[in-house]
């Protein structure tokens, strides 16, 4: 069972109680802090759509600390990030691995950040299937298509040649925040929000 902190906001004579995620959403902040699955994707997509409707001109900020997760769920978030009108600023705090790294790289160019001690990791999709030989073959072909799709998305957002992405994703490929900047996954390593 997880405990969600609450925040009490006072304005004049009234008090308003928010769960922490709702309060962050009020400031146009979305936090992805778990493995990415269908439930997480649906919540993030709903938040993106809500924030676009609320003000299509103001940036949306996505903070990421995730080991990755389901490719289909991550691609649903990715497509929505590309679909909405507001710029999406992405921030890696802790880790952005696998599908979470794709989302980090998919932020608006110039607005992709990593904190100094965060790590990112790219690799090929992982899948396992058993059953009849024909079904195994169908799933193997599908995972290879997903591998090509994800490699092309990473190449598009990082500016790296597809051949380099293909080579680097063959195995787990870890990067520090500075290495992620050199790779093109983030634009800047930041240590403070203060200006």
Curated annotation (Swiss-Prot):
Spans traversing the lipid bilayer: none
Active site: 98, 123
One Pfam family this sequence matches: CLP_protease
Residues in coiled coil: none
Annotated GO MF terms: ATP-dependent peptidase activity; ATPase binding; serine-type endopeptidase activity
GO cellular component: cytoplasm; endopeptidase Clp complex
Extent of the signal sequence: none
Chief location: cytoplasm
The EC number(s) this enzyme carries: 3.4.21.92
InterPro entries: ClpP (IPR001907), ClpP/crotonase-like_dom_sf (IPR029045), ClpP/TepA (IPR023562), ClpP_His_AS (IPR033135)
EC top class named in words: hydrolase
An annotated GO BP: protein quality control for misfolded or incompletely synthesized proteins
CDD domains linked: S14_ClpP_2 (cd07017)
UniProt KW keywords: Cytoplasm, Hydrolase, Protease, Serine protease
Catalytic activity: Hydrolysis of proteins to small peptides in the presence of ATP and magnesium. alpha-casein is the usual test substrate. In the absence of ATP, only oligopeptides shorter than five residues are hydrolyzed (such as succinyl-Leu-Tyr-|-NHMec, and Leu-Tyr-Leu-|-Tyr-Trp, in which cleavage of the -Tyr-|-Leu- and -Tyr-|-Trp bonds also occurs)
Cell location: Cytoplasm
Gene3D superfamilies in the cross-refs: 2-enoyl-CoA Hydratase, Chain A, domain 1
Similarity section: Belongs to the peptidase S14 family.
PANTHER family in the cross-refs: ATP-DEPENDENT CLP PROTEASE PROTEOLYTIC SUBUNIT
Purpose of the protein: Cleaves peptides in various proteins in a process that requires ATP hydrolysis. Has a chymotrypsin-like activity. Plays a major role in the degradation of misfolded proteins.
Subunit and partners: Fourteen ClpP subunits assemble into 2 heptameric rings which stack back to back to give a disk-like structure with a central cavity, resembling the structure of eukaryotic proteasomes.
Protein name: ATP-dependent Clp protease proteolytic subunit
Species this protein is from: Thermodesulfovibrio yellowstonii (strain ATCC 51303 / DSM 11347 / YP87)
């Amino acid at each position: 069972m997880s405990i969600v902190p609450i925040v009490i906001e006072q304005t004049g004579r009234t008090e308003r109680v928010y769960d922490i995620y709702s309060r962050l959403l009020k400031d146009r902040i979305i936090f992805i802090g778990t493995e990415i699955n269908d439930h997480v994707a649906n919540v993030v997509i709903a938040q993106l759509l809500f924030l676009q409707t609320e003000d299509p001109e103001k940036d949306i900020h996505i903070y990421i600390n995730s080991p990755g997760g389901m490719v289909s769920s991550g691609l649903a978030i990715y497509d929505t990030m590309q679909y909405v009108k507001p710029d999406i600023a992405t921030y890696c705090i802790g880790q952005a691995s696998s599908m979470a790294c794709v989302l980090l790289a998919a932020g608006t160019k110039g607005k992709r950040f990593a904190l100094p001690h965060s790590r990112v990791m790219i690799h090929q999709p992982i899948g396992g299937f058993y059953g009849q030989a024909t079904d195994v073959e169908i799933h193997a072909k599908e995972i290879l298509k997903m591998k090509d799709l994800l490699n092309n998305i990473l190449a598009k957002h990082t500016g790296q040649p597809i051949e380099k992405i293909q080579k680097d994703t063959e195995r787990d490929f870890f990067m520090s925040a500075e290495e992620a900047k050199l790779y093109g996954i983030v634009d800047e390593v930041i240590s403070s929000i203060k200006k």
